[in-house]
Structures are given as structure tokens and as C-alpha cells.
Design a protein with these regions (language model features):
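Ferredoxin-reductase
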Residues: 1-31, 35, 48-49, 86-89, ...
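Short internal beta-strands
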Residues: 9-10, 76-87, 111-114, 161
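Short, surface-exposed secondary-structure boundary micro-motifs
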Residues: 37-38, 227
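Short, Lys/Arg- and Gly-enriched loop/turn segments at beta-strand edges
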Residues: 39-46, 52
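Structural motif
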Residues: 49-51, 81, 137
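Histidine-anchored nucleotide/phosphate-binding helix
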Residues: 59-73
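Reductase modules of NAD(P)H-dependent flavoproteins
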Residues: 88-228
């Protein structure tokens, strides 16, 4: 791939509208409109080692990083270790690619763990095999529980960046009632938002149509800046 082409990794999920269409019905010549890419995981590594932690679909940004590091030859000088968790052997993606990268770049190594077949989940034992955390940049991506575990286990890393593709469970206190006033900086309009309701839903009820995508706060398309 080059700067003019994108590679999309799509896993079909049960009753998934977009993934089912892409896997079953999309054809050569279809025109798709994509938003701007988003993410804080960059390839400029300032520590002696980079550790990538991926669970499930969290492998996708890691693949992009690995490919970029290989193209820029940074893999020739920076040791990169990937630890990848999936449910079963069948769920592991891009294993041939990872094997090829490991064969071509001695600084790259990877391990795949199977949570359903062998119950190998991220834990303290994995941390103890890595040496001094203050010399490692750690990137982690996966479900919210996986990301939270990584944040706890690798809190002493020189750099720690996590991304989650599912939301943590949250329940508002039943006694937490009332409204919060939110003032929009562009229109200077003030909107009363019920506690426990998302800003996006409240704005839509007021006839305002902000940009949005997943409606869960994951894709960041509806992200906005808090002025104060």
C-alpha cells in the first residue's frame, strides 16, 4: 500500500448492517465516503522499545503501525513486540503477515494468546517478562475491559496510550436528577440537558444536528472541545 490507498479490515458480525454489506454486497467500483482518521498512536517512538497490546479488533491500528514502522525502516532500530489476544485460533487475523514481518525484521516479535481455548488473558505474568517498564512505550487497543487492565498493569510505562472500541459499563445514580446547562460556542445558544442523557441526543431533540457516527463515543466523530 501507499499514501494513495487504504486497506480496510472488516469482520462480519451477527446482524451487523455495515459489516454484512461490506463483506457480502460491496463490489469493485463502489464509492464510499470516509471521515478523517482518528487516533493518538503515533510511530515516532522515543523509548528503547515499543510494546503493542491488542485484543480482538484492536489488532487493526497495530497492523497500521507495524506496516508504517517497516516502511520507514524504524523496525531496523527499534525493538517492537506485539502481544495479541483472540478467542480462538480461527479469530486470529493477519497471522501470515505477522510471520512475514518477523522473518524480515529481527527486531519484531509477536505472541498470540487464546482466551477461550486456553484462558490466556492479559495479567501480571505478562508484565514480568518485559523488563523495565520505564524504558517502554506501550500502546493498547481492545474492548474497554482490556484497555482498563492494560492501564492498570502498565501504569509505570514511560509512555502509555490506550484506545477502546467498546464502552465501559456506567450507571447514573438514581438520585442524580436535574439539568445541566450547556452553552454552544458557535451559536452562543444555551441548552438544558437532563443528567444521564448524552449531549448528542439532547442537541438533536433541540433541532440541532451535530456530526456523529457510532453514537457511542467511540469513533470520535461527535467529539467537541470543552471551552471551560
Amino acid at each position: 500500500l501507499d499514501a494513495d490507498h487504504l486497506c480496510l479490515t472488516v469482520k462480519k458480525v451477527d446482524q451487523g448492517l455495515v459489516s454484512s454489506w461490506l463483506v457480502e454486497k460491496s463490489q469493485v467500483g463502489d464509492i464510499l465516503r470516509l471521515g478523517q482518521p482518528y487516533g493518538d498512536m503515533q510511530q515516532s517512538i522515543q523509548t528503547p522499545k515499543l510494546l503493542l497490546l491488542a485484543a480482538g479488533s484492536g489488532i487493526t491500528p497495530m497492523l497500521s503501525l507495524i506496516e508504517s514502522l517497516s516502511q520507514t525502516k524504524q523496525l531496523n532500530k527499534t525493538p517492537v513486540q506485539l502481544m495479541y489476544w483472540v478467542k480462538t485460533h480461527q479469530d486470529a487475523a493477519y497471522t501470515d503477515y505477522l510471520k512475514e514481518i518477523a522473518e524480515n525484521f529481527p527486531n519484531f516479535s509477536y505472541q498470540i494468546f487464546y482466551t477461550q481455548e486456553q484462558d490466556q488473558r492479559l495479567n501480571q505474568n505478562h508484565v514480568e517478562t518485559l523488563g523495565a517498564l520505564n524504558e517502554i512505550t506501550v500502546y493498547a487497543c481492545g474492548p474497554s475491559g482490556f484497555a482498563s487492565t492494560a492501564e492498570s498493569l502498565f501504569a509505570e510505562a514511560a509512555v502509555l496510550q490506550t484506545e477502546a472500541f467498546s464502552l465501559s459499563q456506567f450507571s447514573a445514580e438514581q438520585t442524580d436528577i436535574g439539568f445541566i446547562n450547556v452553552t454552544l460556542t458557535k451559536s452562543n445558544k444555551t441548552v438544558a440537558i437532563p443528567k444521564g442523557q448524552s449531549i448528542l441526543s439532547s442537541l438533536e431533540q433541540q433541532g440541532i444536528k451535530p456530526n456523529h457516527g457510532c453514537r457511542m463515543g467511540i469513533c470520535n466523530k461527535c467529539a467537541c472541545t470543552k471551552a471551560q
